[in-house]
Amino acid sequence: RMLGKANFYAVINEIFSESKIDDIELQKQAIFLVPQLFNSFILTTNFDRVIEHAFKLNNQELNFVGHPGHSDILFGAIGTEDPRLLYKFHGDIGQGLDSSSNIILTAEQYRAFYKKNSPLLRDLKKCFRSRSILFLGASLEKDRTMDILESAVERGSIHYAILDCK
């Protein structure tokens, strides 16, 4: 079925809507534990509302959910002990998508957001240089995020990952 841009984003909104999240199923997933394990700054490529919903189910609040274009809030949070910030660097489905959406989904959007000296690259590099990062659920395969991490890592910086056993 062919969709125009507006209809395409309407379908994406519907599919990834927070109302589609099954609370009982979410409580069985590892993501449900994130609010119990981390009470600080969270970075994600996910544009859905699962992390926010997990915080709600755990009766915890995030101070701010940011996405590209919120650099000032991101940089302010980096310097605080308990920012309770979720930064969704591929955008946020909850912001109401349209054909000029800020989520990163298409090849064209990836090229635009990840181009040299883009605000997104600047934001991620600052995060990687300012904080130790724990990667959860990331494959850590060679991709744009790993390329940024490699270019941003300074001698002596420490980052962590929890990976699936194969």
Outline where the language-model segments fall.
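Conserved catalytic-core helix/loop/strand module for nucleotide-ribose chemistry
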Residues: 1-132, 136-166
